[in-house]
Amino acid sequence: MRMGSLICTCSSSSKANTNARISDSSTWYHQPGQHISIQTFRELNPAPTSSPTSTRTVILGDGEHFRSMDDQPEGVNNLQTTLTPRHLTAAVNQRLLRSLEN
């Protein structure tokens, strides 16, 4: 099985007068003919083992649109959005640029 592209972005922030640090990271990967998955992690004082706070799975629909579903905590409305491949690429590019600026 051949894996597709893997892009990982990370950013962290902290206040000067505290040891608390918040770290955000996203992993984006694609397997041709299958699905695109974006996992986002948010941690306070990151530990070596962590689980995603949210996962977005984007499934190729009719070749023109992607269907996006967020896994959210129970009780939260699960909203569904539609992204074109161009919008999805733009969103990933913006996130990568923001992470590189930090």
UniProtKB/Swiss-Prot annotation:
Highest rank taxon of the organism: Viruses
Key words, A-Z: Host-virus interaction, Inhibition of host innate immune response by virus, Suppressor of RNA silencing, Viral immunoevasion
Keyword Transport attached: no
GO terms under biological process: symbiont-mediated suppression of host innate immune response
Signal peptide residue numbers: none
InterPro entries the UniProt entry points to: Gemini_C4
Keyword Mitochondrion: no
Family, as annotated: Belongs to the geminiviridae protein AC4/C4 family.
Function in brief: Pathogenicity determinant. May act as a suppressor of RNA-mediated gene silencing, also known as post-transcriptional gene silencing (PTGS), a mechanism of plant viral defense that limits the accumulation of viral RNAs.
Protein name as catalogued: Protein AC4
Organism listed in the record: Indian cassava mosaic virus
